[in-house]
UniProtKB/Swiss-Prot annotation:
<protein>
    <recommendedName>
        <fullName>Large ribosomal subunit protein uL11</fullName>
    </recommendedName>
</protein>
<dbReference type="InterPro" id="IPR020783">
    <property type="entry name" value="Ribosomal_uL11_C"/>
</dbReference>
<keyword id="KW-0694">RNA-binding</keyword>
<keyword id="KW-0687">Ribonucleoprotein</keyword>
<dbReference type="InterPro" id="IPR036796">
    <property type="entry name" value="Ribosomal_uL11_N_sf"/>
</dbReference>
<feature type="compositionally biased region" description="Acidic residues">
    <location>
        <begin position="151"/>
        <end position="160"/>
    </location>
</feature>
<dbReference type="GO" id="GO:0006412">
    <property type="term" value="P:translation"/>
</dbReference>
<dbReference type="InterPro" id="IPR020784">
    <property type="entry name" value="Ribosomal_uL11_N"/>
</dbReference>
<comment type="function">
    <text>Forms part of the ribosomal stalk which helps the ribosome interact with GTP-bound translation factors.</text>
</comment>
<dbReference type="GO" id="GO:0070180">
    <property type="term" value="F:large ribosomal subunit rRNA binding"/>
</dbReference>
<dbReference type="InterPro" id="IPR020785">
    <property type="entry name" value="Ribosomal_uL11_CS"/>
</dbReference>
<feature type="region of interest" description="Disordered">
    <location>
        <begin position="141"/>
        <end position="160"/>
    </location>
</feature>
<dbReference type="GO" id="GO:0003735">
    <property type="term" value="F:structural constituent of ribosome"/>
</dbReference>
<dbReference type="Pfam" id="PF03946">
    <property type="entry name" value="Ribosomal_L11_N"/>
</dbReference>
<dbReference type="InterPro" id="IPR036769">
    <property type="entry name" value="Ribosomal_uL11_C_sf"/>
</dbReference>
<dbReference type="InterPro" id="IPR000911">
    <property type="entry name" value="Ribosomal_uL11"/>
</dbReference>
<keyword id="KW-0699">rRNA-binding</keyword>
């Protein structure tokens, strides 16, 4: 059984047979409309966000399997805040303010993809992404909030 795998980013619920999906899967000889329909069905909850999709096609039978990843952490943070982009000058310009509770929510969504072994550390990883995006957490630089988490200031958030 020879199989080929393609990984691609598509907008949740809005995959089309055009680029970038069409040119990537066209040469595989699988039914493109079935692929598009299944991707749209599986990514409908991530509307407006770029979602990683993995398509594995059996070259002999032309069967395919689609697995959906979670959107990048940056996309989840932006969606949670309801903004288009982070700061264009992180460190000098603040784009928005995020709460530890919001960071925890994103950490739960991304937990399987993160390196952390518990939600506290996963939340700190999400806060690190916020720092890179020019987004404050709890009204201050995310690095300070990470220290506060280490000191136990937000332990009540992680025991919910």
């Amino acid at each position: 059984m020879a199989s080929q795998t393609i990984e691609i980013l598509v907008e949740g619920g809005k995959a089309t047979p055009g680029p970038p999906l069409g040119p990537a899967i066209g040469p595989l000889g699988i039914n493109m409309m079935q692929v598009v329909e299944e991707i749209n069905k599986k990514t409908a909850d991530f509307g407006g966000m770029k979602v990683p999709v993995k398509i594995t096609a059996d070259m002999d039978t032309k069967d395919f399997e689609i697995s959906i990843g979670t959107p990048p952490t940056t996309a989840l943070v932006l969606d949670e805040l309801g903004i288009e982009s982070g700061s264009h000058e992180p460190g000098t310009e603040v784009a928005a303010d995020f709460s530890v509770e919001q960071a925890f929510k994103v950490a739960r969504m991304k937990f399987d993809d993160l390196l952390a072994n518990d939600y506290k550390h996963a939340t700190k990883e999400v806060i690190g992404t916020c720092v890179s995006m020019g987004i404050n957490v709890q009204g201050k630089d995310g690095r300070e909030t990470q220290k506060d988490i280490d000191n136990g200031d937000y332990d009540d958030v992680f025991t919910q």
